[in-house]
Amino acid sequence: MKNVLLQATGLVKRYGSRRVVNGIDLEVREKEVVAVIGPNGAGKSTTLDLILGLKRKDAGNITYWREDYKAQVGVQLQTAPFFPKLSALDNLKLFAALRKRKLSVEEGVQILERCGLREVVQTEAARLSGGQQKRLGLVHHPKLVFLDEPTAALDPRARREIRELIRRLADDGASVVFTSHDMEEVGKLADRIVLIRDGRVVAEGTPEDLLHRHEVENLEELYLKLTGEADA
């Protein structure tokens, strides 16, 4: 069995009397891609914020695989993490330095080339396209990556490039947790799906298991059935 990188149990977040996250459990194992899906306002993004410490939880426990995990966690919440005035290469070298690792120019160029960024090695990050910026934010070899709608607002080519990069990260040994409303994207990328509705997990499993268990033919039907949007 694969090692557990993240174990979140009983997460609760209240805004006044409303529980936007209501007892959510989430487990992430090494080398797996987990898609967190659900309608707008279901609690997906808030759950990620609680796990990352960006918002204070009202209840629950979060355990990572090691105490100094932060240097090995990559985060991309709607906007990509980078330093706009630094070149793509200098951003990569800084990411490495933050993880206490030396990165030579040659190594940096090779990494950027592998991610389709060879032509912008010396370009300021602020001048990169949206798709290039998102790729730059994911190339520093994290062990665990959190992505909130990583392909939102991108053109078809950029979406394809980000999907390929996510799959490459997983193939290289990273675990990825991402939110998405695109069921085609979820089907192509996810090893496991967690569906949230009204702040609770209502379904969890592999795509194949969920389709079989709920007797539907595709993930779009599954989504509509379990969120109640099929009756809307």
Label each region the model flagged.
Residues 52:
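Helix-to-loop junction immediately C-terminal to a conserved catalytic motif
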Residues 56-71:
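Conserved ABC transporter NBD signature motif
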Residues 93, 97, 103-120, 139:
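Conserved ABC ATPase "signature" region
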Residues 124-128:
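Conserved ABC ATPase signature
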Residues 145-148:
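Catalytic Walker B motif of ABC-type/P-loop ATPase nucleotide-binding domains
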Residues 186-188:
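A short, surface-exposed alpha-helical micro-motif characterized by mixed small hydrophobic
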Residues 204-205:
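ABC ATPase "signature
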